[in-house]
């Protein structure tokens, strides 16, 4: 019955007892079904009318709302209108078994039952936790009137009591399962006398009529019996709720076949009792949204209006209901103390977060401390040892076995006690267990045991050293990942500086750790412990950090590269090089192949960090506003977020259904926007990676997105192929403004520094400026006109304006289109400066430095350039990417800039350290002569001059000539020959540099040139399909003309013969003296890409774009064998010296080794693909060469690889800085190798002795 109805009945009880006659009234109530015949007899048995009336009213008080309404109607019907009027104000609005009132859907029946049972009311500030409440109710339904236990357990302050009360605040549950009522008993930590008092009070509550006994039970056993009888006879189908049970022995007093719901921190308390048991674990946190909701209710603000500190408070306490409520209550009194309470929480000052409340403890540390104090004395120290664990780290059992020097089973038993008492959490992973502490428990332990922490960390390290050697940890060990991630942390925290330096400066440790977890965490440790490592040796620390940062894109790939070989590429002064060389020599004794890069002194690495977060092209990357993070997106449809200093991955989000084209941080760094070819724009929470909004109003792919620069009112601008710009307000679900005006795709947009204007670039050849407030066009600048010549009709010229960037003062803007960067004054639209980057590349992207006059420009030929806009001079040339650079961006302070490329990497460069524009870069046209003690290289540089380089000494002689297209050295280094783009051929005599010119040149660019063995004759081929034989000493010429298309290449044979092959699919054998064809082989339907000649000159091989290779005899016009099976163009081939084997390489990165005699395939050498869709061998295999003993094969592709011919396995890989190697020159003894990559870097490699 409602409390209001009951009060009304009690208030007018005396008047009713005096006046009413019960017999007729009871007839009405029996007919209504609210009074039984037996109850009528009880009333009638009373002696007087007054006693009969008193007995009826007592019965009605024990009934529900229906009885009250029936009694009221009976009074009216029997003429007691005055008495009925007294009861009218107490009439319930609804009956007990139907309908709900307005208070959260709780019926008056529920409210009455809970009030009578002593169930606590909802807290003043309350948020629902529907999932957990439903889980508890499901377990209660399972009791179904039968005896049993439902246990709600969790750590201190997680809201167990509130959840228990909320679970029984349900009409159908009470009516269906617990019609006898609910009885709440607060237990807490009790001794026997305290428990007896609780039981006495409960028995008295349940037997208010004292029908079973006139006195209270004298001991626990008697109380247990009394309780059993009361529950069975007077309160069947009722629920007993025991709140905050600590000890198993307490429950034995209630183990008398009741239905019991209990809350506890120790889930093992029910182990001591009988009957069915159900368990509901309570997560320690509310979740971000629920936590914010509680704070907003306490301070009476909207969730979205809460300050940033509110989010940090929730994050810091992991949504602990107790902490959020304590802080909320304090903020209600002191609304300006957000920062103060956040600081106390961060500093673990729990004593200062104190507030009186309905909870038993005024501060979190009190609530947690009592749990620890209740542990057995013999395991308290073990719990103290957990003080050194880090937040959110799951620790395998084996780690604690090492720490405590105990067997696994013993450790699991100890830890299970902590888990049972909600002092520790456990994750089961297959057969093994991992344990972790809640953040607040970590904070509590850290604060409580602060004076012991250093010793505890030292104990951890010492125990590790007893069990393991750092680099011998095996990946199949349960605890190996923990030690790799946290051993350095324990050493640093233990003040064990010597041990930390020895660990971090060990190439063995670097190798073992990077192979398992990649380089980012190690870089983070070098940054974090730099102050300690620098004490030992600042230079060594820098050596290792630079090694990891610049090789990160390799160290994160599979198969894992040989770290010793990578270390050998470091400068000779580096500690990494010293250790690598030592290891290489030790392993070399066992036959392991290692290579020394002997000319590496001339190479400077300019990048500060190289990361490879994507598995496909990276289209865009950007810094966060604080410069600490980088977001990137690309063709793999993902958004990646990582630390700008170390490359540590923070978020990996499958963002869109198609390529992600652009991403941007909001000005407060709270959000990241992405836009995609799937036509959608998405907003993500930058901390959690949670999707916040999806906008899909563009009708074509969305190319760009950019947030306003100020955070007071966040707007996002997007541009699309649908020709429109759109402005989005993150507080709205739909587009705020659409801007019309462009007549072609919008490629790029940027807000001005003051957010007043929005600049947009389009394929229509214009830059437009828009007023952000009105969304009206303010100005249009026709960029296209700066690319028109007088004879070109404007409609025939397409100028795509790629991007734009504002100057820091907002008065100027740079625009990139084709191969020019233009600087405009936004007030006058006048052109202030023009930068021309050259004819051979297009500008992909540009960015203006925030603090000086530098602009960084990304070019299509893999290069990035820094220009001074004022002086219009190039300041730096940054090479390192292996493919198109799609995006560049300065950091907010301008000290560094990033570049994003098609090669799947992002590089971070320090602005001040990038090299000045003085480096001369080599082209891939080289010739090599190997001498006994020297390797001489003739190379063409980017100025098209010639360089003669002594490999070992590094001495360079410059032979400047313009437009050199190919070159060669005579066998004895007496002469240099070269051809140019115009078809001319010249010879330079060394060392006097006298020049001889061919009187008859080629009509087109010379592509190949070669001296005969005696150096007297020079043979050349060109794009004009003619081979020229020039005896330059006599001036005689022979022209070999028969090929129908360009000659691909040629080789000299014995007896004045020459083998040539062509795009026309033929191979021809010539007599170079007479110029006649001796043999004409029609080899392939496609282009003949290469030929190789056996050492006995009886056979040759041909490879083709038709994916086949063939073996031929010079005596037969039909092939001996056709070699099929390659899935790409077969680009190269080589015979072994003994003529038994032939190796072929294709465009898929596969090398095949064949038996020459029968054409059978012996081995397929295909490196494991790094990522799905990535070419093996880093690209096309362009050259192969056997060792003299035919046991080893070297191949060139994206990098160099050495193979064991007998097994087909890779024996070494040398990763060049660049890629797309065209050829490898190998010394006769197979110990020196020379090549040039596409960055123009020369590699002279020698087998390490």
Curated annotation (Swiss-Prot):
Q: Does the keyword Transferase apply?
A: no
Under InterPro entries, the record lists:
Apaf-1, APAF1_C, APAF1_CARD_dom, APAF1_WHD, Apaf_helical, CARD, DEATH-like_dom_sf, G-protein_beta_WD-40_rep
The superkingdom of the source organism is: Eukaryota
Report keywords, A-Z.
Apoptosis, ATP-binding, Calcium, Cytoplasm, Nucleotide-binding, Repeat, WD repeat
Q: Where is this region: Interpropeller linker?
A: 910-921
Every copy of the CARD domain together lies at 1-90
Task: Quote a single Gene Ontology cellular component term.
Answer: apoptosome
Annotated GO MF terms: ADP binding; ATP binding; cysteine-type endopeptidase activator activity involved in apoptotic process; heat shock protein binding; identical protein binding
Q: Where is the NB-ARC domain?
A: 106-415
Question: What Gene3D superfamilies would the database entry show?
Answer: 1.25.40.370, Death Domain, Fas, Helical domain of apoptotic protease-activating factors, P-loop containing nucleotide triphosphate hydrolases, Winged helix-like DNA-binding domain superfamily/Winged helix DNA-binding domain, YVTN repeat-like/Quinoprotein amine dehydrogenase
Keyword Cytoplasm attached: yes
Recorded consequence of changing residue 265 to S: No stimulation of CASP9 activity
Q: Which PROSITE patterns match?
A: CARD, WD_REPEATS_1, WD_REPEATS_2, WD_REPEATS_REGION
Q: Where in the cell is it found?
A: Cytoplasm
Binding locations of ATP: 154-161, 265
Q: So which tissues is this one expressed in?
A: Highly expressed in lung and spleen, weakly in brain and kidney and not detectable in liver.
Repeats (WD): which ranges?
A: 613-652, 655-694, 697-738, 741-780, 796-837, 838-877, 880-910, 922-958, 959-998, 1001-1040, 1042-1080, 1083-1122, 1125-1164, 1176-1213, 1214-1249
Q: Any extra detail in the entry?
A: Physiological concentrations of calcium ions negatively affect the assembly of apoptosome by inhibiting nucleotide exchange in the monomeric form.
Annotated PANTHER family: APOPTOTIC PROTEASE-ACTIVATING FACTOR 1
Q: What does this protein do?
A: Oligomeric Apaf-1 mediates the cytochrome c-dependent autocatalytic activation of pro-caspase-9 (Apaf-3), leading to the activation of caspase-3 and apoptosis. This activation requires ATP.
What assembly does the database describe for this protein?
Monomer. Oligomerizes to a heptameric ring, known as the apoptosome, upon binding of cytochrome c and dATP. Oligomeric Apaf-1 and pro-caspase-9 bind to each other via their respective NH2-terminal CARD domains and consecutively mature caspase-9 is released from the complex. Interacts with UACA. It may also interact with Bcl-XL. Interacts with APIP. Interacts (via CARD and NACHT domains) with NAIP/BIRC1 (via NACHT domain). Interacts with CIAO2A.
Q: What is this protein called?
A: Apoptotic protease-activating factor 1
